Regions:
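P-loop NTP-binding core
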Residues: 1-292
């Protein structure tokens, strides 16, 4: 199982939207996906209809009162399971009353140990991280194979992103490979075009692939449908497919590129609840990635 953490120290860069669309794209390609929503806001959990009941699930999991299998929830989207958000966990973790949990986190291996229990059950685990930088994040960085950082191509965002990546690369606690990509790109803006044209000249961690700012991407939280379910034919899909292909090439994950080419649908073994979060016909086909 490959572990990818979607992270940025600041909010508003599209971490959750990217998480949801990547999960649905990978499931559509036939990969089994575990989504772990570590953002207390719970956007990813909301999308899949699996909002947490604020019962300290994460705290009890890390304190070994629960197993990871007890907190994993199935979804109506075939091939995607979710560990939903826990809005109380961050506050409790930082609270003095949670000293035991904090001590358990100090070795920064607890997240990795927890995910190792399901490493043979999924192809990919995607973690939707909260903004900021806490001890929790160091645990995530230790567990993740890839730290994927969405960023907006604007001066302050680029400056802050460079500082963040330099700090992460010099940190002994960060074991992950670090890659970044431009998100919410508007090519009609001269500054966005400028940063697109200069990427990779000085920073080889910035991917060539980018995700544009399209209304259909922005609307996924309202419709509770990823772009891979809203439209059968959409050029937006291709941007995510190209992004994933470049990630796999940089990470040498060739076995995860269109490996099975199945179609996301509702599990035949477990009929979806009514109404389902995602509805797809059996004849929906995956858009082929363009080489252009």
């Amino acid at each position: 199982m490959k572990i990818i953490a979607l992270y940025n120290i600041k909010g508003g860069v599209g971490k959750t939207t990217t998480t949801v669309n990547l999960c649905c794209m990978l499931a559509k390609q036939g990969l089994s996906v575990l989504l772990w929503d570590m953002d207390p806001q719970g956007g990813s959990s909301f999308f899949f209809g699996r909002e947490n009941k604020n019962d300290n699930t994460h705290g009890r999991l890390f304190d070994r009162y629960l197993t990871i299998y007890e907190v994993i929830q199935s979804t109506d989207t075939y091939q995607i399971d979710v560990i939903s958000n826990d809005s109380k966990f961050s506050d409790q973790f930082m609270n003095k009353a949670a000293r035991i949990t904090a001590l358990n986190f100090i070795n920064k291996e607890l997240m990795k140990i927890t995910l190792d229990e399901v490493k043979d059950d999924y192809d990919v685990c995607i973690i939707d991280c909260s903004p900021g930088r806490f001890l929790l994040h160091d645990n995530i960085f230790t567990a993740a194979d890839l730290l994927l950082i969405p960023n907006i191509p604007a001066p302050l965002s680029v400056y802050c992103n460079n500082l963040l990546v330099n700090e992460l690369q010099s940190s002994v606690t960060v074991k992950s490979k670090i890659l970044s990509f431009y998100n919410m790109v508007q090519t009609n803006k001269s500054l966005h075009k400028f940063y697109l044209e200069e990427r990779n000249e000085n920073n080889n961690y910035i991917l060539r692939s980018y995700i544009p700012f399209y209304t259909e991407i922005e609307s996924i939280s309202f419709k509770k449908e990823s772009i891979f379910h809203q439209l059968k034919e959409s050029k937006t899909n291709i941007y995510y497919e190209k992004l994933w292909q470049e990630i796999c090439e940089r990470m040498q994950w060739q076995g995860l590129i269109n490996s099975k080419a199945l179609v996301v649908g509702i599990s035949e073994e477990q009929p979806a609840a009514t109404p389902p979060v995602v509805q797809l016909g059996n004849n929906d086909q995956l858009n082929k990635t363009s080489n252009g």
